[in-house]
Amino acid sequence: MTIKVLVVDDSALIRNLLGKMIEADSELSLVGMAADAYMAKDMVNQHRPDVITLDIEMPKVDGLTFLDRLMKARPTAVVMISSLTEEGADATFNALALGAVDFIPKPKLDSPQDFNEYQDLILEKIKSAAHAKLKTQRAAPAVVVQPSHKPALSNRVINTQLVAIGASTGGTEAILSLLQQFPAVMPPIVITQHMPPGFTRTFAERLNKLTRLNVKQAEDGERLLPCYVYIAPGDQHLEVIKVGGSFKTRLTQGDKVSGHRPSVDVLFNSVAECAGANTTAAILTGMGKDGADGMALIDEQGGKTFAQGEQSCVVFGMPREAIKRGVIHHVVELPQLADKMLNYLASLKRD
């Protein structure tokens, strides 16, 4: 069975470009192309697509309004096509909160190589979206619990432990849900979420507003502090190194690792090397296997490893791969994951 795809975009150029890319793949079937939400609504009812690529900025009815109505009337896997602006990034994260599975920036195709890379990426995202769990099918997010009900962490734990998190497809909302469950006082947290340049700063700002922690996009060479969360910038690997008695960030433009830059494996490997048994790591929803090798090294060095359970994942690929390797100590659905991690940290020897 081929995957039925509907393209919704007010630009004829983008519609035709995406249409040609989809038609070139034997696993996909282009069932329609719509220039606005009204045409899209009719085509959704007529063709019942498996996946919709949806432009955020459209005339008459914008992409977010259409997405909200779609998710209430006929939940469908949606990949947002996003503009590389601050407003576009904000709208993208709102779309993911409404239930879109994934997003990709609008194409900037200055060379044949750009075209081929973009085609590979959009086709991969469409296929992944077709097999993703929609918001209505996943375990409900946890209700945010007040800090007084969370176990207190010792000063030694706060100042010696590192928390590392990796995610891909579905990760933006999973990370938000997880961080909202954490109290304001935590060891430093480092996160790699697969995301293109131009979106990670807005993502960090969003998390900073919606959680008790101080969240920022990581900069090169900064000292990791308790109560802070550091997000890997798009298109740069985030590593942690130890300088003297302090953990510091290192950003690099090295080759893609496990198919990605930033790579979860790069982050996890670095944390395993410099923090060892003082590492608490979680691998969340995502396509592929990035993070499995790094989790193996964290396990080998004596750190504690967690994986998000299948029922709450948008895509179970990354957690499944790490679980298959036998390097995950606890598999926990997202609503309970923060409590499990906090209980572990609270159980460590007090000062």
From Swiss-Prot:
Catalytic residues, chain numbering: S168, H194, D290
Subcellular location: Cytoplasm
Entry's EC annotation: 3.1.1.61, 3.5.1.44
TM regions (residue ranges): none
CheB-type methylesterase domain location: 156-348
Molecular function as annotated in GO: phosphorelay response regulator activity; protein-glutamate methylesterase activity; protein-glutamine glutaminase activity
InterPro entries to which the protein is assigned, alphabetical: CheB-like, CheB_C, CheY-like_superfamily, Sig_transdc_resp-reg_Me-estase, Sig_transdc_resp-reg_receiver
Keywords: Chemotaxis, Cytoplasm, Hydrolase, Phosphoprotein
GO biological process: one example: chemotaxis
GO CC, one annotated term: cytoplasm
Enzyme class per UniProt: hydrolase
Reactions accelerated catalytically: [protein]-L-glutamate 5-O-methyl ester + H2O = L-glutamyl-[protein] + methanol + H(+); L-glutaminyl-[protein] + H2O = L-glutamyl-[protein] + NH4(+)
Function: Involved in chemotaxis. Part of a chemotaxis signal transduction system that modulates chemotaxis in response to various stimuli. Catalyzes the demethylation of specific methylglutamate residues introduced into the chemoreceptors (methyl-accepting chemotaxis proteins or MCP) by CheR. Also mediates the irreversible deamidation of specific glutamine residues to glutamic acid.
Family named by the database record: Belongs to the CheB family.
PANTHER family linked to this entry: PROTEIN-GLUTAMATE METHYLESTERASE/PROTEIN-GLUTAMINE GLUTAMINASE, PROTEIN-GLUTAMATE METHYLESTERASE_PROTEIN-GLUTAMINE GLUTAMINASE
Entry text on domains: Contains a C-terminal catalytic domain, and an N-terminal region which modulates catalytic activity.
Name the UniProt record assigns to this protein: Protein-glutamate methylesterase/protein-glutamine glutaminase 2
